[in-house]
Regions:
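C-terminal motif of bacterial Sec signal peptides marking the signal peptidase cleavage site
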Residues: 8-11
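Beta-rich carbohydrate-recognition and catalytic domains
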Residues: 13-188
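Sec-dependent N-terminal signal peptides
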Residues: 1-4
Length: 188
């Protein structure tokens, strides 16, 4: 028994350790080994996907992925409309197009930011809470607020122009108040 217990202690030694040191200071570029037409992740026809916002749709029984459409270059002051996808397997996607457009330069949601979506069985509406970013806010303006848009069918969205959740109303910043994560409570 003692010999069996000592065997693991003698099987390794400092001579077995091989550490290869790399000189990373001369490396300036890493090239991907992936195929140029990488199809693992969704890529829109134009621009890029920003901040995916996944949501399981209990009505359609599929997943919806809302995202910030990033055109690069984006229009000055108004950017990141919310677009959407649907999928049942996270490998094949159907584009839903633009769901929630940016507001105008003078509106609170000139640029849109990340949000989250819930479905209400009570009124059969989808609710997407998102960040509204004001273009060039004055010192009295809130740079970022949480806003909401609703839809009866996940296709046609209506912005509620009376709902503004402002951080400074609750002791938070009026400049940095974004990316709401909304969930349904026990009360529905």
């Amino acid at each position: 028994l003692a010999a069996t217990m000592l065997a693991p202690l003698t099987s390794c030694s400092d001579d077995d350790v091989v550490v290869e040191q790399k000189d990373w200071s001369t490396t300036t570029l890493f090239s991907s080994t992936d195929e140029p037409s990488q199809s693992t992740y969704y890529k829109p026809q134009g621009g890029y996907v920003g901040d995916p916002m996944p949501f399981y749709d209990p009505v359609a029984k599929d997943f919806k992925i809302l995202y910030l459409q990033d055109y690069r270059p984006n229009a000055a002051g108004t950017y990141h409309p919310i677009w959407g996808l649907s999928t049942t397997d996270a490998a094949n996607y159907t584009s839903l197009g633009e769901l929630i457009p940016c507001g105008g330069l003078a509106e609170q949601d000139a640029a849109l930011g990340t949000g989250s979506t819930i479905y209400s069985e009570a009124d059969h509406l989808y609710y997407t809470f998102y960040t509204g970013n004001k273009y060039q806010p004055s010192s009295s303006d809130n740079a970022e607020v949480v806003m909401v848009a609703t839809s009866p069918d996940f296709k046609t969205w209506t912005k509620d122009r009376t709902f503004f959740l402002k951080g400074d109303d609750y002791g938070y910043s009026k400049k940095d108040f974004r990316d709401p994560f909304v969930f349904k409570g026990d009360d529905g």
